[in-house]
Amino acid sequence: MKKLTSMVLTIGLGSALLLAGCGSTDSKVSDGVNKMLETTDELSKAIDSGDQAKVKEVGPTLEDQWSSFEDDVKKDNKDLYEKIEKYLDPTIAGSEAASLDKEALGTLNEQLTDALKELDKKTE
C-alpha cells in the first residue's frame, strides 16, 4: 500500500511540475507578445505624428523584447515565428533609418502588429 501511495504521489507531483512548466512558457510568450504590441502601438503613434526621434527610440526596443521569448515561438509555432521575423527586421531597420518613410514603416509596423496578434490568439 505504501508503494502504491508513493507512486501515485510521485506521478502526481511529476505531472504538476510538467504542467507548470508548460504554463510558464505560454505565459512568457503571452507576456512578451503583449509588451511588443504595446511597443508597436507606441511606434505607430510616433510614425503617424512624424516624430522621428521617438521612432528611433522605440523601434529598436522591439528586438530586445522579441529575443526574450523568440526561441519558444520558434519551437512551438514555426510559421508564426517566420512571419514575425519577416516584418520585425525591416521595421527595426526602418525605425533606425536616417530619414523617416512614414508610409513604408507604417505598413511594416501594421503587418508586424497583425502577426503578433495572430500569435497572441494562438497562445490564449
Model-derived regions: residue spans:
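Mature extracytoplasmic or organellar-lumen-exposed domains after removal of signal/transit peptides
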Residues: 23-124
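Bacterial N-terminal signal peptides that target proteins for export
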Residues: 1-11
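C-terminal motif of bacterial Sec signal peptides marking the signal peptidase cleavage site
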Residues: 18-21
